[in-house]
């Protein structure tokens, strides 16, 4: 048994040995025949380079590197379809392979775009947004997911002081009655029962009206008196600055007199004249001067 270089085994019994010393020519003829048959079979199946496949790494990277990569990928897909071993790539219209010169869209869809994967037309992907009628999905229209409408806040009601239902109306006093009541109040602020009865009958008023008017007039007089006392206290406070160097001396003491004299002498002497502080008369105020707040009136 003899082994051929192309891997074809030929038995001696199959081809036979020719007579007359021709044993070396028969195996060489069989090897040539087998090589020719293998070449025919390989020619019937054309080899496709893996780099020309539209989904290979080289084809995907070439789309971003070279501007004419899409034309080369289309040509590769045409040759693959002619061989019958590949399917139509995604994102390429069915009639674009047969007519490469036909006018195409300004921007064809890519292999991994939304339109290429879902095979949707371009007009379905681009929707005209109308500001007047915005489109809302069903889950947004449901009350479960949509926010509640804004509540209009009503203006706060005016809260007035509520009077009693059985409150008596206010008594409108005349000018003559008011003058008589004021004159009587200056004479005597508290009236006895007999005086109140006699005075109310003379003014054509009830005793209760006269009694309430005198109560209100006494409260008003008390408020006015307190305000006058406060004004007198504010006016009685001395308007003097605190003592120099944080020292306080009672006015009228020898230390205060010496300090005032030294301040006046210091202000009058020296090349630069300084205005001396006015010295209050000794003995006018006997209050102890210190760090305190002085109110201006």
UniProtKB/Swiss-Prot annotation:
Protein keywords: Developmental protein, DNA-binding, Homeobox, Isopeptide bond, Nucleus, Repressor, Transcription, Transcription regulation, Ubl conjugation
Disordered: annotated segments: 1-50, 63-110, 127-157
Cross-referenced Gene3D superfamilies: Homeodomain-like
A Gene Ontology biological process term: negative regulation of gene expression
Keyword Ubl conjugation: yes
Compartment(s) where it occurs, according to its Swiss-Prot or TrEMBL record: Nucleus
Record's comment on post-translational modification: Sumoylated by PIAS1, desumoylated by SENP1. Sumoylation of Lys-9 and Lys-127 not required for interaction with H1-5, transcriptional repression, inhibition of myoblast differentiation, or binding to gene promoters.
Annotation: DNA-binding region: 166-225
Top-level taxon of origin: Eukaryota
Subcellular location, principal: nucleus
One GO term describing the cellular component: nuclear periphery
Coiled coil stretches, renumbered: none
Bias-annotated ranges (Basic and acidic residues): 127-136
Database matches in CDD domains: homeodomain
Biased composition (Low complexity): 25-38, 70-83
Gene Ontology MF terms: DNA-binding transcription factor activity, RNA polymerase II-specific; RNA polymerase II transcription regulatory region sequence-specific DNA binding; transcription cis-regulatory region binding
Cross-link (Glycyl lysine isopeptide (Lys-Gly) (interchain with G-Cter in SUMO)): 9, 127
Transmembrane segments: none
Protein function: Acts as a transcriptional repressor. Capable of transcription autoinactivation. Binds to the consensus sequence 5'-C/GTAAT-3' in downstream activin regulatory elements (DARE) in the gene promoter, thereby repressing the transcription of CGA/alpha-GSU and GNRHR. Represses transcription of myoblast differentiation factors. Binds to core enhancer regions in target gene promoters of myoblast differentiation factors with binding specificity facilitated by interaction with PIAS1.
PANTHER family: HOMEOBOX PROTEIN MSX (PTHR24338), HOMEOBOX PROTEIN MSX-1 (PTHR24338:SF8)
Quaternary state and interactors: Interacts with CREBBP/CBP, TBP and SP1; interaction with these transcription activators may inhibit autoinactivation. Interacts (via C-terminus) with PIAS1 (via N-terminus); the interaction is required for the localization of both proteins to the nuclear periphery and specific binding of MSX1 to the core enhancer region in target gene promoters. Interacts with H1-5.
Family: Belongs to the Msh homeobox family.
Name this polypeptide is given: Homeobox protein MSX-1
